[in-house]
């Protein structure tokens, strides 16, 4: 079987690629990074290291690469014969690869290939595959859309594995934590015959996506932003500070309250899940930079993102969200010149009053929440002086 995977980066190779290879798939990685594509084509394999005691190595074989910037036609031809398409490129990039996927579907139609294919966005976002579908359909006419409705599925997915920023002499070598979770919405699949081992299938994915987003992503970002306020540069340094861990525990307590109320998760099971998350952040074999975990703060301040959405929903339920608001106040101090959103955020803070910056970045219309975030920001500002 063949999977066309968009994104030859660390997550693509170290998580999605490993799982697919373990299921006997050949993988064609699609990327614009010449170095990665050239090495994949030269070696047809790469090594994954598990960041844990023993540092076990896993060898992945039967892979190749296509540079979509140089040879988009080859990408379409590969999709035309693929059994599955996956992505791990970041939510903002999905719309840019959509025309390539559309071309692949057009070619499948032209070749009368009616074998159903699922196209799965493995991104940190709610409704990733369905969002990708909308972008793909913009490049299809009515007849092509009708054909795709019958033959192409876009099942949403929830993915979870910490893959830190890293540099190695071997550009394909990647280190990942042992824990991994990949859940696919089986109700949206067109080819349910493909059942991957190491992947869970659910009728309703939203509880899993929110559990992951509001626990792992919110918790990890909390450690980054709180650690940043205290001058730490790595997550490893930050989690040695009890005050940082306490902040993460308070935040996870609030998001856990929401998740248990909203989705009916078993409290005991969920608290064990939260404990496991904190232990993953404390993994001594993973050296993750605060800059990587905290990057793109404007996106992370979004209305439906990891902080503002749980804040809104907790307020609606009359529950406590004070630790979440406190962390959002810290986000405005994230200042890394290599991160364009961080630079933009700092410029906004110079040009506009804080309450206007809060409204712009969060899309909040609730002035009480805007003022609560403003108060948190001003508290941190006073403490920093």
Curated annotation (Swiss-Prot):
**Can you state which reaction this protein catalyses?**
D-mannitol 1-phosphate + NAD(+) = beta-D-fructose 6-phosphate + NADH + H(+)
Q: What SUPFAM superfamilies does the record point to?
A: 6-phosphogluconate dehydrogenase C-terminal domain-like (SSF48179), NAD(P)-binding Rossmann-fold domains (SSF51735)
Q: Identify the GO cellular component terms for this protein.
A: cytosol
- Chain sites annotated for binding NAD(+): 3-14
NAD found in the keyword field:
yes
Record keywords: NAD, Oxidoreductase
* E.C. designation(s): 1.1.1.17
Which Pfam families does the record match to this protein? Answer: Mannitol_dh, Mannitol_dh_C
Q: Which HAMAP family match?
A: Mannitol_dehydrog
Q: What is this protein called?
A: Mannitol-1-phosphate 5-dehydrogenase
